[in-house]
């Protein structure tokens, strides 16, 4: 993101090329099983919302600063991953970690919610909705995520957003 912003500000084509190269490497690491060291053991395999969420925002930043033909396709894929695997409408929740198939892991690793992190993801999706001419589906998805996690994350006793909550 920094190299792309610098490239836009300075007109430095080498910095733009470096930003695109690093973005490609990030895509490779994010999508090639086994390339990254897993956060958890194979006892309870899982995946987190962090990678698709941050990669979506990175692609948005590259698209807005220097452009990259891969961005639109990858942003769409990462939004679908978040919606399909992490947004749980039946319990009005956005999960931080899920099993590889998107199911909830009934263990501390899978039950821990991070409301602020999910709200950040909602913000990125709403930003994308604006970019896509106020895409109704993305507005609805982002608002749903925000509503779910605001309700779960607001500290009714002291105010503010709680860092972590149990899903149940």
Predicted features and spans:
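Glycan-recognition and catalytic cores of secretory/periplasmic carbohydrate-active enzymes
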Residues: 1-168
């Amino acid at each position: 993101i920094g190299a792309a912003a610098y490239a836009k500000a300075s007109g430095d084509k080498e910095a733009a090329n470096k930003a695109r190269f690093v973005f490609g490497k990030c895509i490779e690491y994010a999508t090639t099983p086994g390339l990254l060291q897993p956060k958890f053991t194979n006892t309870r395999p899982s995946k987190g919302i962090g990678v698709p969420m941050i990669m979506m925002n990175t692609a948005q930043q590259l698209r807005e600063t220097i452009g990259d033909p891969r961005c639109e396709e990858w942003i769409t894929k990462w939004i679908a991953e978040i919606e399909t695997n992490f947004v749980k409408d039946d319990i009005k929740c956005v999960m931080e970690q899920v099993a590889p198939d998107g199911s909830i892991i009934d263990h501390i690793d899978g039950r821990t919610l991070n409301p602020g992190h999910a709200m950040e993801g909602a913000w990125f999706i709403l930003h994308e909705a604006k970019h896509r001419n106020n895409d109704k589906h993305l507005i609805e998805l982002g608002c749903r995520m925000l509503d779910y996690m605001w309700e779960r994350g607001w500290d009714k006793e002291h105010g503010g957003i709680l860092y972590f909550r149990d899903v149940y």
